[in-house]
C-alpha cells in the first residue's frame, strides 16, 4: 500500500485532500510544519484542527518544528527585500525552501513514505515523451495556485499529489460536510500568513523595520510630499500617497539609497519588458530559442501574451506584447501555454516603454 504524508494546515482544503486519499486506499499520515515563533501563533489552532482530522480518520499525525527555517528563509527574506526597496513574494519561496522540499525529505527519510500531498489547487500530468512531470492549472481557475508553485523542482513534483486539482472550492466544502470533517465550515484563510498573523502586511513590516520618513518625488526629482518609510510602498501603488495632484500618480520606483519614493503618471508606470532571475523551467526543459507564452506577473493578474527569451545563468528576458503596468521587482513572472505552466522566475529589472499607452 502506497504511503502518503499529507501536509495539514488545519484548513478545509488540506483536510479534504487527506480524506480523499484515505478513502482511495492510501496509507495516509498527517504532518504539520510548525512555522511561527512565539506563543499562540497561527500554527497552534491549525495544529489542533489537523490533529483532530487525523483522529477522525484514525491515522498518525506528526508535527515538525520548522520555525528556524521559516524565520531565515521567509521572515528575514521578506524584511531584507522591503528594506532594499523590492516587494518580495514569500509564498513561492516558502513552498520550495520550507514546505515541499523539507517535507518530502522528512516523509521519505523519517516516515518511509512514497509521496507527499497538499491541499493546493493544481494538477499534475506525466509526459511520457519528455519524462517530465507537468504542472497544470486547477479546474477551479479562481482558486488556481500554480503561480505559487512555479519554483518546485522536478524531484519534488514527481513525488507529490494534489487531490483537489479537479475540484472546485464549493465541491471541496461539500465533501468536507458529507464526511463530517470538523473543518468543513472553517473560514477561508488569507493567502499571506504573515499578514494574517500580524493583522496586516504593514503591521508585520513595522515590527521589523524602523520607519524613516523621506521624500516622495517625481521623475525630475521635484519633491511632492513625504513618505512614512519605503517599506510602506510598492510599485504601482496609487492610494495612500497623500499627494494632491492634477492627475493620478503611481509609485514607479523605490530608491532605498536616497530613501525616496518616485511617482509618475500612468504612462510612466508602464513597462515593455523585464528580466527575471532564478528561473525554474517546469513542464519543459529550457528551450534553445525564444518561445511565445502567456505571462502572469501577479497572483490575481490576467495572463498576457509575451515572448520569453532564455538567458544564461538561470535568467530570462520577457517582452510583453503590450506594455504592462505595475511590474514589480521581487514578484514572480510565471509563463504558461494554456493551462500548462512552462516556467517562472523573480522579476529583477524592468524597462519602461517609450510608446504611448
From Swiss-Prot:
KW Iron (keyword) present: no
Subcellular location: Cytoplasm
Catalysis performed (reactions): S-sulfanyl-L-cysteinyl-[protein] + uridine(34) in tRNA + AH2 + ATP = 2-thiouridine(34) in tRNA + L-cysteinyl-[protein] + A + AMP + diphosphate + H(+)
Enzyme class of the recorded protein, top EC level: transferase
UniProt site (Interaction with tRNA): 120, 331
Any single GO CC term annotated in Swiss-Prot or TrEMBL for this entry: cytoplasm
Renumbered residue ranges of the record's region Interaction with tRNA: 143-145, 298-299
A GO term, aspect molecular function: tRNA binding
Binding positions (ATP): 7-14, 33, 119
HAMAP family in alphabetical order: tRNA_thiouridyl_MnmA
PANTHER family found in the cross-reference section: MITOCHONDRIAL TRNA-SPECIFIC 2-THIOURIDYLASE 1 (PTHR11933:SF5), TRNA 5-METHYLAMINOMETHYL-2-THIOURIDYLATE -METHYLTRANSFERASE (PTHR11933)
Role noted for this protein: Catalyzes the 2-thiolation of uridine at the wobble position (U34) of tRNA, leading to the formation of s(2)U34.
Protein family per UniProt: Belongs to the MnmA/TRMU family.
Protein name stated in the entry: tRNA-specific 2-thiouridylase MnmA
Organism for this UniProt entry: Synechococcus elongatus (strain ATCC 33912 / PCC 7942 / FACHB-805) (Anacystis nidulans R2)
Amino acid at each position: 500500500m502506497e504511503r502518503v504524508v499529507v501536509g495539514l494546515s488545519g484548513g478545509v482544503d488540506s483536510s479534504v485532500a487527506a480524506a480523499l486519499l484515505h478513502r482511495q486506499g492510501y496509507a495516509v499520515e498527517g504532518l504539520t510544519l510548525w512555522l511561527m515563533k512565539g506563543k499562540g501563533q497561527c500554527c497552534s489552532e491549525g495544529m489542533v484542527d489537523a490533529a483532530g482530522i487525523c483522529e477522525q480518520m484514525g491515522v498518525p499525525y506528526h508535527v515538525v518544528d520548522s520555525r528556524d527555517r521559516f524565520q531565515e528563509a521567509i521572515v528575514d527574506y521578506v524584511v531584507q527585500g522591503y528594506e532594499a526597496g523590492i516587494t518580495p513574494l514569500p509564498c513561492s519561496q516558502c513552498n520550495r525552501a520550507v514546505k515541499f522540499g523539507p517535507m518530502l525529505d522528512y516523509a521519505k527519510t523519517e516516515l518511509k513514505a512514497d509521496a507527499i500531498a497538499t491541499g493546493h489547487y493544481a494538477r499534475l500530468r506525466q509526459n511520457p515523451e519528455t519524462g517530465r512531470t507537468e504542472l497544470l492549472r486547477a479546474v477551479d481557475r479562481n482558486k488556481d495556485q500554480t503561480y505559487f508553485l512555479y519554483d518546485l523542482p522536478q524531484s519534488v513534483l514527481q513525488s507529490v499529489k494534489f487531490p483537489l486539482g479537479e475540484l472546485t472550492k464549493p465541491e471541496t466544502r461539500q465533501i468536507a460536510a458529507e464526511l463530517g470533517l470538523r473543518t468543513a465550515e472553517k473560514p477561508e484563510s488569507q493567502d499571506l500568513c504573515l499578514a494574517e498573523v500580524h493583522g496586516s502586511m504593514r503591521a508585520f513590516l513595522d515590527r521589523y523595520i524602523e520607519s524613516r520618513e523621506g521624500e516622495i518625488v517625481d521623475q525630475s526629482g521635484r519633491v511632492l510630499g513625504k513618505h512614512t518609510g519605503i517599506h510602506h510602498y510598492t510599485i504601482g501603488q496609487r492610494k495612500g500617497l497623500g499627494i494632491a495632484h492634477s492627475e493620478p500618480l503611481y509609485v514607479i520606483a523605490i530608491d532605498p539609497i536616497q530613501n525616496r519614493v518616485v511617482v509618475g503618471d500612468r504612462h510612466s508606470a508602464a513597462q515593455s519588458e523585464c528580466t527575471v532571475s532564478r528561473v525554474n523551467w517546469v513542464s519543459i526543459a529550457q528551450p534553445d530559442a525564444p518561445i511565445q507564452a502567456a505571462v502572469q506577473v501577479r497572483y490575481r493578474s490576467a495572463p498576457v501574451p509575451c515572448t520569453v527569451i532564455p538567458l544564461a545563468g538561470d535568467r530570462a528576458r520577457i517582452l510583453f506584447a503590450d506594455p504592462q503596468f505595475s511590474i514589480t521587482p521581487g514578484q514572480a513572472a510565471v509563463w504558461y501555454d494554456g493551462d500548462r505552466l512552462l516556467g517562472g522566475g523573480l522579476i529583477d529589472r524592468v524597462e519602461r516603454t517609450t510608446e504611448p499607452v
